[in-house]
Amino acid sequence: MAVFLKNTIFAPMKEFLQILRRFVPPYKKYLGLSVLFNILSAVLNIFSFAALIPILQILFQVDGGIRANDYMEWDGTLGSIKEVATNNLYYYIQEFIVAHSASLALLVIGLFLAFMTFLKTGAYFLSSATIIPIRTGIVRDIRNQLYQKITSLSLGFFSEERKGDIIARMSGDVQEVENSIMSSLDMLFKNPILILFYFITLICISWQLTLFTILFVPPFGWFMGVVGKKLKAQSTEAQSLWSDTMSMVEETLDGLRIIKAFCAEDKMNWRFNQVNSSYRDNIMRVNIRQQMAHPMSEFLGTILIVVVLWFGGILVLDYGRIDGPTIIFYLVMLYSIINPLKEFSKASYNIPKGLASMERIDKILKAEIEIKDKENPEHISSFEHQIEFRHVSFAYTDHQNDELVYVLKDINLVIPKGKTIALVGQSGSGKSTMLDLIPRYYDVQEGEVLIDGINVKDLAVHDLRQLIGNVNQEAILFNASFKDNIRFGKTDATDEDIANAAKIANAYEFITKSEHGFDTGIGDRGGRLSGGQRQRVSIARAILKNPPILILDEATSALDTESERLVQDALEKLMKTRTTVAVAHRLSTIKHADEICVLHEGRIVERGTHEELITKDGYYKKLHDMQQV
């Protein structure tokens, strides 16, 4: 049984406490206040219930009513405190009854009970109120840490994780932590104090009865553990299914045009219903098991009261070691201690659900940041000479076969300052990977990428990326205004700077014609704009950043002829005086590059100007001729 209790009750509680140790320290002052108010609430509760004994004795004339001998002096020993305090309390009540009346004494004691209850409930409220800043603050901190970690992780992490799964952890899992773990904070800080004070009171009333009561706690705890044993595993499965659901929603939103084009609404609805129903079935089992906590603890608590009432009756009727009003006070205190124990049992069902979600959150929080500054990195503020790929090989890990798959093999390339280098080749030849290595989105397995002779791994990541501007095939815009998107990389830019950048990017005209000009919102991912407009806003953003190095990744491949002309014109303005590395699908857009490198299966197989490569009649000319057809 000891091993079972350790695995089913103490192990989850240990994990729970470890989570609190991670997140509670900033809120220690609230924790201290909560403990203080909980102690005050427990003491006041004991005194308010203690008032029941004289009330019962007066009301029912037990043993002839209030009975006391003469006033007793305390002899200084701890063992006599209870006897002296009880005797003198009864003595003063008896004197009050003689001087006034029993009914007035009953009223005074009743008012005392009401006053103590008022103070107790006030302390109880304050103890709960001081927990709320801890609870909400921890959830906020988890979300902040999760978001900060997402922005810190390398791109390689997200190539192996579904966006919907990450969103599910950010939303559903954090919410489950709040509902399951943080809702148990009050229980953790309040109930141990209540149980301790009530337990001491029970011992003071009758140690024999308390010893008898303790014998029933382990089997009751074991019985509760049986019900909650599988809850954590089921909750983990439920949250995984919730991630599948969110991933499918995200996938559907991204592919809605294709779904409609192929009349696949019914198919997608069926797929979603399958995933959603699986989640519903699993979470239903979890919730049913969780809902057993209250009735189970209520039933076991009632059994305990009945057993104690039977044994207490023996002590009253057969041995006379305790009187009737005192046994009632004992039962009231026992019931008061059962309620916190019920909360513990309820938490034993709630906490495993939250722990399962926290495990999923920690998969992100504890993920290793692969791209980070080394200790004492070199700082760079300008680009003076050249970019160099020196014997660079890059591979990604095929987790299915547990092997490296090389995308680039022994790449050697020098890009002098002010020159434009174009990378061409079939899909999968490694063009975009080469671009990603310059700002160090990934680290190479072999060789090195150098900026002005310094390995990018030795540079501060922030300094390196400040030198680089990006314009991609898909313009990445945010759900904000034109102004906020253009100044995204330079928050201190003036309105004049933003307007000038928009003019150079051929975006000024359509921006100023919009409803609120530069303050007009562009919708989610720039959804209110055409493809060409989105790309020109993206170019304006790069112009405003004014980087010495420019990376273009098929910036015009998805545009119509008119939009391509406007964007190409904007790009040519942007490329002036800058070092540019461009990937192009349409070879016509890179004819004027200083050097064109042709990649095939991860290697540079040809290099030269457009005219030189056409004359060679090699791989580049084949690509060129195919586009002329």
Regions found by a protein language model. Give the residues of each.
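ABC-type nucleotide-binding domain
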Residues: A2, I9, K374, I380-V629
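Helix-loop-helix
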Residues: T201-L215, R289-E359, I364-L365
